[in-house]
């Protein structure tokens, strides 16, 4: 249950973040679940109802359980931003041992280093998520960096020209800057001219920087323009969380019996597909 904690934290006047949701969704094993309406609806309504829930982890520890969480984040951005708020990206060690410190972390942009400045930056999204580790759902392009992740030294938004330009710290390796809209990489490079990608844009754009040290993620830039077509929250799936039959289904869904059945079904599917290919 991811809803109870944000509700109580907001009631008490605090801020919350949803951690490693892929653990609960089990999307690290079944990445397609990051695109299921039932989970998009569930988490979207948490962010809609509790604005003190600032965002979600897109990286946790070595990224094993969160490898599919960027996909869910992108799905949520498409339906939550049109409702009047953003979802900030977080990355955390989840460290239980000293040697786990420094695996995934945030880089805050602060006028001074104190508690109030950190809280304000968290609330406003003035920080980057970063990690030494990059895992993918298909295993392609995975790597472990040395921790010296790419750093952003400047971001310039030209509203007249519709461009965004990012400057990277020359002392940190940055092999590529990828620009992502609706979950897809649509451009690479330090500058994106949004006019060149009008047919591929939705309500946001974000970038990620990859280098030998790891990956650094920006927060989403909301795009406001005439003719923007927004995706609705797939509220048809709310019955699962608001009715007794739905609650029984979710209890069964998170049971070992269901997990075992899903695993067997997946093995059968792979076996059949391999036979067809041969």
Annotate each predicted stretch with a short phrase:
Residues 80-88, 93-277:
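C-terminal functional module detector
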């Amino acid at each position: 249950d991811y809803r109870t904690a944000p509700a109580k934290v907001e009631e008490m006047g605090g801020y919350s973040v949803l951690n490693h949701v892929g653990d609960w969704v089990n999307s690290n094993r079944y990445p397609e679940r990051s695109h299921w309406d039932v989970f998009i609806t569930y988490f979207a309504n948490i962010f809609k109802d509790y604005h003190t829930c600032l965002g979600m982890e897109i990286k946790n520890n070595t990224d094993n359980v969160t490898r599919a969480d960027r996909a869910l984040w992108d799905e949520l951005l498409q339906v939550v931003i049109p409702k009047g708020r953003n979802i900030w990206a977080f990355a955390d060690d989840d460290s239980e041992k000293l040697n786990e410190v420094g695996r995934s972390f945030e880089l805050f942009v602060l006028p001074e280093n104190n508690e109030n400045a950190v809280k304000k930056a968290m609330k406003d999204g003035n920080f980057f998520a970063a990690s030494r580790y990059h895992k993918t759902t298909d295993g392609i392009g995975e790597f472990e960096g040395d921790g010296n992740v790419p750093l952003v030294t400047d971001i310039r938004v030209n509203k007249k020209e519709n461009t965004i330009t990012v400057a990277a710290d020359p002392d940190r390796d940055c092999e590529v800057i990828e620009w992502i809209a609706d979950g897809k990489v649509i451009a690479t490079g330090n500058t994106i001219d949004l006019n060149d990608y009008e047919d591929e844009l939705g309500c946001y754009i974000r970038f990620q920087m990859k280098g030998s040290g790891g990956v650094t993620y920006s927060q989403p830039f909301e795009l406001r323009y005439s003719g923007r077509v927004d995706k609705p929250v797939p509220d048809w799936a709310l019955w699962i969380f608001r009715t007794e039959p739905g609650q029984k289904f979710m209890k069964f869904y998170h049971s070992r019996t269901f997990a075992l059945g899903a695993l067997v079904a997946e093995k059968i599917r792979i076996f059949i597909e391999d036979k067809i290919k041969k």
